[in-house]
Amino acid sequence: MHTPVNYITTWFYKESKEEASFYPQLGQKGSSSLVHSIYMQIQVPFFVTFKHYNPDAQFIFFTNLNQKELPDYLIRLFHKLNVEVVTLPYTCKPPKDWYPAWQNQFYLYDILKYMDDRMQENDTLLISDADCLCRTPLNTLFDAVRKDGSALYEFITDRVYSINGITLPQMEEVYQSCYGKEAASSITYYGGEFVALRKDIISKINIAYPQLWAFNLEYVKQHPFKLNEEAHILSLLAEHLNIRNKTANRYVKRMWTTPHFNNVQPGDENYPVWHSPYEKKRGLYYLYRLIGEKSEITNEADFWEKAGKYTGIPHISLKKKVKDRLTTLWMKFK
């Protein structure tokens, strides 16, 4: 009898100069050496924290790079933590100049195609962005996915806000045009940074995705808006396949810690998973340096005290503000 497997995965797609899109949080295009080095470094705190609290899960790192192209410290880490590296081509790539930013994001659907062939009944898959830290075991998350089929992160419900070039009412127009019916309830935006799915739901997504994507390519020829990124697609597929929920909201929060916008509140430090997009070249870099060659958490209380100070969760200290500024300047001239 097959014992169900919980897969925890993240990914990095290295863009070429010809296809490079803009990464707003890093202020660089995806082909830059800075972007590459930062994304390699943040794999360390990601895998160390997720593995520490979920030792029985199977871990995979997806990339278009060959393993020999990874930095030595990452190869050593993956060997120690038993992280599998899967080199996967990008076949779901959008057309050139599709949207100015984040054109690597449709790699998610290549991962789903790969995992569909690999997973068995009742296996579950978590695809997480690498700028996340795990604080607790995720057994209850996987149990919920095994029961309900999915755990999605509902991030935006504002019907006026333009979400990377499209509003929720406009997404509903695309949905109605594609499927010939209105959504059963108002469309909401599900973030692509934390998506957990059961094997059979992955199969359904892989069947439904080509139709929606082909429709999207034709739709933009006659309309001023389109589904620009992977989460737009996911949000419509969730409605179409009746897998909508906000289960993942109990586990993760996208925590903005910029000088201009901060949505972190006291108590947010208790989330099982911290998503810290602004901290890629700041707090997560400091954690990469802290972990070093140890590749493990030896003192949980000490580690999370430092992690909170480094990432500004739940409070940003004056010391962090100064250190962040100096680190940013140093990286500019690195």
Label each region the model flagged:
Residues 130-132:
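Short acidic donor-binding/metal-coordinating loop in glycosyltransferase active sites
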Residues 97-107, 166-170, 263-267:
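Short, surface-exposed amphipathic charged segments that create phosphate/polyanion-binding patches used
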Residues 134-171:
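Conserved donor-nucleotide/metal-binding helix-loop-beta segment in metal-dependent transferases, i.e.
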Residues 37-46, 93-126, 136, 140:
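A conserved donor-nucleotide-binding helix/loop in the catalytic core
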Residues 259-334:
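Long, low-complexity C-terminal extensions of enzymes
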Residues 20, 70-74, 136-139, 235-236, ...:
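A short acidic (Asp/Glu
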Residues 1-96, 120-121, 312-334:
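N-terminal anchoring/stem segment of glycosyltransferases
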Residues 178-281:
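Catalytic core and acceptor-binding pocket of nucleotide-sugar-dependent glycosyltransferases
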